[in-house]
């Protein structure tokens, strides 16, 4: 069959190191035959072994979603609330500090922090940016050594728009205050027709790209992500991967690729009906992980599944499909869990290592930037120790 010849030719070219095209990636993503998918899996697994070996990394971190009050209305989001709506919350700085202290006491090396978009944090005559700088200081003043992985491109763009500041100014001030890296979320699918249906109030593809590249120029590394398994096609996914690879070749600022399969149990009825399922399809997610590994090649070597969305067993299976990282402990998670995910909100380092062992690989602890670390705690400042007594 012609398609089998094309499949072998595409995989052979990837194995030889030729850069995969967007149409080739779409072709692989469209494979439904189990035998064809196994060929893709095997090719991705071989490339993973060649690029990063047999060891699998994990990070001890805590996720803090500091507020769910948000002015935007993304069609898939069950997390956001209006300010006066039941269930709306905004953590005060003392609560955020408490969560950080608990994480540090548990050996965390990273705090990941994101929240809703709330113009009311501006205060009387102040800047929205000032609130975010205070958030950063609440963590970094007592814990200067903790790695702060905070604020998506959408959050940075929101601050710049509200305060009428250049995005470069916002990013520079956040970095100077203590933000060490950023989550590359709010990407969803970087294809405008899809974005207009899925999240029309979010920043555009072009604005996302410009914000990300500005962050990289500012010295802020970032994860890269894709929200898959909703209204997009195989070609849309491939186009998205192409946008990410183009950025990576220009800046080298992405640390990893994380696939975020759509969870829609609590999504609006119209979107649920259109997608036709509420939980991720594991086989589809695994194929996408494998194609991403082949597509990025040497330009982006760290690949992570989402155990929150796939469950730890599914994430462990992804280690056979090109992934070399099992993710973080998180300690808590609200955005995906409120959407109806069944993967849980917290994992212990022991559970992550066990999942890696189950996949017949060796686990090691890393930091946010994929440097191996020894298990250690970050000691709080003396003032915090005194306050805790």
UniProtKB/Swiss-Prot annotation:
Binding site for [4Fe-4S] cluster: 70, 74, 77
SUPFAM superfamilies: Radical SAM enzymes
InterPro entries membership: Aldolase_TIM, CofH/MnqC-like_C, CofH_family, F420, FO_synthase_su2, rSAM
Cofactor section: [4Fe-4S] cluster
Metabolic or biological pathway: Cofactor biosynthesis; coenzyme F0 biosynthesis
Domain annotation Radical SAM core: ranges: 56-298
Keyword terms: 4Fe-4S, Iron, Iron-sulfur, Metal-binding, S-adenosyl-L-methionine, Transferase
Annotated disulfide bonds: none
Chemical reaction(s) catalysed: 5-amino-6-(D-ribitylamino)uracil + L-tyrosine + S-adenosyl-L-methionine = 5-amino-5-(4-hydroxybenzyl)-6-(D-ribitylimino)-5,6-dihydrouracil + 2-iminoacetate + 5'-deoxyadenosine + L-methionine + H(+)
Sequence similarity: Belongs to the radical SAM superfamily. CofH family.
Alphabetical list of PANTHER family matching this protein: FO SYNTHASE (COFH), LIPOYL SYNTHASE 2
Function: Catalyzes the radical-mediated synthesis of 5-amino-5-(4-hydroxybenzyl)-6-(D-ribitylimino)-5,6-dihydrouracil from 5-amino-6-(D-ribitylamino)uracil and L-tyrosine.
Name of protein: 5-amino-6-(D-ribitylamino)uracil--L-tyrosine 4-hydroxyphenyl transferase
Species annotation: Gloeobacter violaceus (strain ATCC 29082 / PCC 7421)
Gene: cofH
